[in-house]
Every structure is written in C-alpha cells, then in structure tokens.
Amino acid sequence: MSGNTLGTLFCVTNFGESHGPAIGCVVDGCPPGLPLEAADIQAELDRRRPGTSRHVTQRQEADQVEILSGVYEGVTTGTPIGLLIRNTDARSKDYSNIADTFRPGHADFAYWRKYGVRDPRGGGRSSARLTAPTVAAGAIAKKWLAGQFGVRVRGYMSQLGPIAIPFSSWDDVPGNAFYAPNAAVVPELEAYMDQLRRDGDSVGARIEVVAEGLPAGWGEPIYDRLDADIAHAMMGLNAVKGVSLGAGFESIAQRGSEHGGEITPEGFASNHAGGVLGGISTGQPITVSLAIKPTSSIRVERRSVNRAGEPVMVQTLGRHDPCVGIRATPIAEALLALVLIDHALRQRAQCGG
C-alpha cells in the first residue's frame, strides 16, 4: 500500500535511505533450486556503482551485497531472499544548507507536503541510491530468466542531452562509461560532460532496453498488461519522465499499413509494437525507451522557498550525477527483468506454460 513493493508472484520490497546505515530489499517468490551466490549479484551492482568515472557522482560506495536469507548451499530455497548493501561514504553535512529549503525539480517539496517531514540527507528515500537494491533483485531475475527460457535483457544509451548516439554494436556498450553502443561518439560525450560539470549543471538522456528470447503469451489483458506493468516499473526509476514501447510516439505519424506488423510463416515482418500486442508478449523482442530528465541537484543558483514559504536562492552542494542516465542502463535492465519474471511465473500459474 505504501508503494515499496514491485510484483505479484515475484515480489521485491525495497527499503532504506541514501544516508542511513544500509539499503536493501526482500525478494519473495523466487523459485527454489536456482544456483545463486553473491558474485552473481555483485557483477550487476558493479555496473551501476557510483564513483566509477569522472562523469558520475564521486560518492565512493563499494556496494558489496550480503545475502542474509533464502539461499542454502548455493541454491535458492524458495523462501524470502534478504539482500543488504551497507552505506559507507555518506556526507550528510553537505546537505545542511537545504534542510529547510526545497530544491527546484526535486522530490523535496512533494515529500514534505505528503508526510509533513523529510530526510534531506542525500534526498533520503527519493535518492537514486535506492536503485542499488533494485539492481540486486534484478540480477536474480536475469539469471532465472536466462536459465529457464534463454531470455537476455540488455540496454544502452541512445541520446545524452542534444547528442544522438547512433547504434553501431552491442560490443561497444560495456567498453565505455555511458553504455553507448557507438565507440566513435564517446569522445564527444566526454567533452560535453566535462563542460557540463564545469558549468555546475545537469542534462537528461534517453535509454533503450531490449529483452530477447521470451516466448509469446506473457501478460494479462486489460489492467495487468505486460506493457502497462513495464511502464509502471520504469516510472519507478528516479528521473524517468517518459516510457514508450516499440515505435512509441513515432506511431502517431505512421499509417496502419506501416505500423501493424504483417505476419508470415517465418514470423512478424516488423516490430513497431515493441513485442507486445493486447498486453501480451508476441515472442518478438521487447523494446523499451526511457526519457530521463536532468538531475535536479546542481550548483547553479535557482529560486525556491523554505518551509515557511519565504523566497530563497538554492544551490545544491554534495556529490551528484550530472546525468542520471549514465548509470540508468543497468537499473532499467533490472526493472524489465523483474517485470518479465513476474509475468513468467503468473503465466505458469494460470496456463501451465
């Protein structure tokens, strides 16, 4: 009810704050017998870990995961899996100047109006720090999906600010800090980010996520559509302001003769629907695009108010990502995997498939 759990049969409950002792999650509903060790999860966490390049927050967190329960002798037991990640490099003093004011574009104001109290340290519960447990849970989902169905979930950045990144090769994605699928564009991205940091400003990005290998039939009609659940999950990622599948908003300019993929004995002739029709998977790749807004914590002074409603000028200190999108790719992959494993289990429960 309080919005901290994702999923129906494969449930992930996320807990913690940016500057608390630890963050983590409880994964409930994981099938028993899945080989699992901390290294399986750590590999994914290392992909989103802060402080790995000059273009992301310089907060130094090892993000070492601890498996507290649900695994015995290297396999899952079917009971809840507790995952813990300790916070080791919080600097709460950096936020003393915004304890009583609200950052423009940040959740500060909305949290205060909802709860009547807020934790200003690193954004508290609204911090992107809370995506680490999501990635940890997603690592479990990815491994199960790959083992059971051969499903592969991966993503990349297709645009950073005004710079479009033409797709060249999946092989280029892990070789740079941006998850860019085109190594030739990386120097331009680096130069842009260096100038952005000097300006004390931030920028948005576009992320693409693709799931391949899943069968047709996953998803429920009407209100539990597969695409609806994907959009719901993706909007839970900090700074996401838009989600589309397949051709997305480009569908507006398409005619039905173009958008509706013809079906042949060999399969579909196109995939403008992004792998989902009627809320149910078609067996084609699931393709998702995310629009991520610029980070709201910047050094540029902006107008705001304090808790008394008085006008103030706000400048955010501390260590922040000038572009949340740079580390968003592994998070978006995790969220897509979590939705897919949930629907895979629901399909098995209802239809036996």
Curated annotation (Swiss-Prot):
Molecular function terms from GO = chorismate synthase activity; FMN binding
Q: Does the keyword Chloroplast apply?
A: no
Q: What is its EC number?
A: 4.2.3.5
Which UniProt key words apply to this protein? Answer: Amino-acid biosynthesis, Aromatic amino acid biosynthesis, FAD, Flavoprotein, FMN, Lyase, NADP
The record's listing under Pfam families reads: Chorismate_synt (PF01264)
Judging by the UniProt lineage, the source's domain of life is Bacteria
**Residues annotated for NADP(+) binding in this entry:** 48, 54
The residues that hold FMN are: 125-127, 238-239, 278, 293-297, 319
Q: Name one GO biological process term.
A: aromatic amino acid family biosynthetic process
Pathway where this protein functions:
Metabolic intermediate biosynthesis; chorismate biosynthesis; chorismate from D-erythrose 4-phosphate and phosphoenolpyruvate: step 7/7
EC class: lyase
Q: Which Gene3D superfamilies match?
A: Chorismate synthase AroC
Record text on cofactor binding: Reduced FMN (FMNH(2)).
Q: Keyword NADP on this protein? A: yes
List required co-factors.
Answer: FMNH2
Give the similarity note.
Answer: Belongs to the chorismate synthase family.
The record's function comment reads: This reaction introduces a second double bond into the aromatic ring system.
**Which PANTHER family does this chain map to?**
CHORISMATE SYNTHASE
The name this protein goes by in its record: Chorismate synthase
Please give the organism: Bordetella parapertussis (strain 12822 / ATCC BAA-587 / NCTC 13253)
Gene of this entry? aroC
